[in-house]
């Protein structure tokens, strides 16, 4: 019997008799050390109903290649999974023992990855020896290399650089028995942690770039494409959004989320109340219209103040103790002839209780562009001119 073929038959018997210890030793080398659990996973895989026939055919082909004994043939074949991914390559290892060629049964391990988002993840687990992996934020990081089969590994994960930090005890689950061809494998994480995406409804009614998410009342910038997390979440997290219109803040509904139970982000939908925003818009429009009328009335009274050289005509329009008040008290007494005409309002903006009005007016044939700041009291529904600048 060809001795190389005998070594393959010996391996067959080890698999047949579930000799996990011997299989692990045969598959281990200077680069990789396989455990009995790795060997058990391999045996369970090749003995499964779906893979038994393919495994037998591959073993027979390897023995046939040995029988053919082609010159310079150092690789006799491979045991693969159902997608053609190499599991074990059987070849000469270049050594002889009493004129007998030794075979190497070289396992192919698969890299398994984890993905972090706005956090750093530190994983600690046992695989033959203690492992520690630091996964940086917004990166895919290799967790380790694993053989064929399914693994469920007790793991401690520490979340850092996140809104909610902490250490979690859970497990990572890995399934290499049905991974397709050339697919990157990610570990399924079983921890009390959360990560999610957020879609806002009715946000177009508010100002762009005014949105914030509040996660347990800690605000972060909103981005519809962003994944938020991963967050330490032993119980639940509170999430809602705020947005602004003319400085007024609006809030969405609040969602309390629990931990993730699969390897995908949760998809949250938060909605601003359209009726609330429309109601504010309607009331604010009336305020701005009233501000236009107010500034026109003020301009008429300002003309009187200049004509009579008496500040009293505008004293009820100008904010007390403002810089504008000091300035106008001097100006109305000057010898200059001032009479503003052709007042045209070009723009009105609001920010909370400040109304900003841009207008044009003429004086002695010259056109002036003036910007006014009005202070609005939403209780009395009254205005005071706080500042003005001519361009």
Language-model segments: what does each one mean?
Residues 24-85, 311-354, 365-366:
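Short solvent-exposed beta->alpha transition segments
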Residues 196-205, 209-210, 217, 222, ...:
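Lumenal/extracellular ectodomains and adaptor appendage modules
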Residues 59-149, 158, 170-202, 342-391:
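Exposed beta-sheet edge and beta->alpha loop/turn motif
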Residues 138-162, 224-251, 256-268:
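Short Pro-Gly-centered beta-turn/loop motif in secreted/extracellular proteins
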Residues 242-244, 248, 289-391:
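Long, low-complexity, Ser/Thr/Pro- and Asp/Glu-rich intrinsically disordered
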Residues 103-107, 182-197, 258-287:
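Conserved "repeat-terminator" motif of extracellular CCP/Sushi domains
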Residues 3-19, 23, 281-307:
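Short, aromatic-enriched amphipathic alpha-helices that serve as compact interaction elements
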């Amino acid at each position: 019997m060809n001795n190389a073929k005998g070594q393959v038959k010996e391996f067959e018997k080890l698999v047949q008799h579930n000799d996990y210890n011997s299989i692990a030793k045969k598959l281990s080398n200077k680069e990789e050390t396989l455990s009995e659990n790795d060997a058990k996973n391999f045996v369970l895989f090749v003995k499964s109903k779906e893979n038994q026939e393919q495994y037998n055919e591959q073993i027979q082909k390897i023995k046939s290649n040995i029988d053919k004994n082609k010159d310079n043939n150092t690789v006799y074949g491979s045991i693969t999974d159902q997608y053609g991914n190499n599991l074990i390559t059987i070849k000469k290892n270049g050594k002889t023992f009493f004129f007998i060629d030794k075979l190497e049964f070289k396992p192919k391990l698969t890299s398994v990855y984890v993905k972090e988002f706005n956090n750093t993840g530190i994983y600690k687990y046992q695989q033959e020896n203690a492992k520690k992996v630091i996964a940086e934020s917004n990166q895919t990081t290799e967790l380790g290399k694993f053989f064929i089969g399914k693994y469920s590994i007790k793991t401690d994960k520490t979340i850092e650089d996140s809104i909610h930090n902490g250490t979690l005890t859970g497990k990572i689950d890995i399934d290499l028995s049905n991974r397709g061809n050339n697919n990157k494998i990610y570990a399924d994480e079983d921890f009390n942690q959360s990560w999610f995406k957020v879609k806002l409804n009715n946000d177009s009614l508010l100002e762009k770039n005014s949105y914030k998410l509040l996660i347990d009342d800690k605000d972060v910038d909103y981005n519809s494409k962003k994944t938020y997390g991963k967050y330490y979440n032993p119980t639940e997290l509170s999430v809602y959004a705020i947005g602004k219109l003319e400085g007024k803040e609006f809030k969405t509904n609040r969602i309390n989320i629990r931990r993730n139970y699969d390897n995908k982000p949760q998809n949250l939908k938060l909605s601003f109340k359209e009726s609330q925003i429309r109601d504010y818009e309607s009331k604010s429009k009336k305020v701005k219209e009233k501000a236009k009328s107010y500034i026109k009335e003020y301009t008429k009274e300002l003309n009187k103040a200049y004509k009579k050289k008496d500040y009293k005509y505008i004293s009820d329009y100008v904010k007390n103790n403002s810089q504008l008040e000091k300035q106008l008290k001097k100006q109305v007494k000057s010898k200059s002839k001032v009479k503003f005409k052709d007042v045209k309002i070009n723009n009105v903006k609001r920010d909370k209780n400040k109304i900003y009005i841009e207008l044009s007016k003429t004086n002695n044939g010259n056109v002036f562009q003036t910007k006014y700041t009005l202070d609005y009291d939403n209780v009395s529904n009254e205005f005071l001119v706080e500042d003005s600048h001519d361009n």
